[in-house]
């Protein structure tokens, strides 16, 4: 069953085509990747899917809902979560508070109750803390709960970003270059982590990534962009044999 459908979506910036008639279908409980050279339009597609930017044409459907014109917060509330290429953590807050904030749109108490510390607020705060600890423990981060993110290694900060993205219990997780800045050992750990998340949470994951080892090893379906246009899609084996893809991005097949 499909969880996400992109029907011929397009986006222009000042007359320059960033994404042109791009279509894809993401099946439930699967991992896919969108790859391509710098400036190919990969992150723009994520921005369009999440409502950060508006389509010029085309349609977006998520879990059977037409989300083409929905604002970002309503799309998130339907069960979509995202990480970013550049780590976006609150370094003045503790690790656990960073995770709590990620559940913000699900907090139901109002300003009056919060100001006067009503029982419902205390109960919800307790539940929020417990859920945040469970989320940290899921990715083996619970021992860092009271620390500041700046005290963590870069690899652990990346994992913390994943924890934040998992806090709202998404149906679809979008990972924007999760391997950026990681060393080979951290890349292998990341691959294991993504597989673990997908298998345990039973969610769909779409990855935008430059690191080919990561993509080829964990993504059964790959879409390739060049100058905003899709030039290939298929399995890692099919992508590795696609002449247009090799010419545009991958280089020699020995590099795959």
Model-assigned labels for residue ranges:
Residues 1-256:
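Glycine-rich phosphate-binding loops of nucleotide-dependent enzymes
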């Amino acid at each position: 069953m499909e969880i996400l459908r992109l029907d011929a979506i397009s986006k222009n910036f000042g007359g320059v085509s960033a994404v042109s008639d791009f279509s894809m279908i993401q099946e439930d409980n699967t991992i896919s990747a969108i790859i391509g050279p710098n400036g190919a339009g990969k992150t723009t597609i994520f921005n369009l899917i999440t409502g950060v930017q508006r389509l010029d044409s085309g349609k977006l459907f998520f879990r059977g809902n037409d989300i083409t014109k929905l604002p970002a917060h309503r799309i998130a509330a339907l069960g979509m979560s995202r990480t970013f290429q550049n780590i976006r953590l609150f370094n003045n807050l503790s690790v656990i508070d960073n995770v709590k904030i990620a559940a913000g749109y699900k907090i139901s108490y109002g300003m009056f109750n919060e100001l006067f510390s009503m029982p419902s607020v205390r109960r919800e705060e307790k539940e929020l803390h417990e859920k945040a600890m469970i989320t940290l423990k899921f990715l083996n981060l619970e021992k860092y709960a009271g620390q500041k993110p700046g005290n963590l290694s870069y690899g652990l900060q990346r994992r913390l970003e994943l924890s934040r993205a998992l806090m709202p219990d998404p149906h679809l997780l979008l990972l924007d270059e999760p391997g950026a800045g990681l060393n080979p050992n951290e890349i292998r750990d990341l691959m294991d982590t993504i597989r673990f998340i997908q298998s345990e949470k039973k969610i769909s994951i779409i990855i935008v990534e430059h690191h080919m080892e990561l993509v080829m090893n964990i993504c059964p379906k790959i879409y390739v962009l060049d100058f905003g246009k899709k030039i290939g899609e298929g399995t890692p084996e099919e992508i590795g044999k696609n002449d247009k893809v090799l010419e545009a991005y991958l280089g020699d097949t020995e590099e795959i």
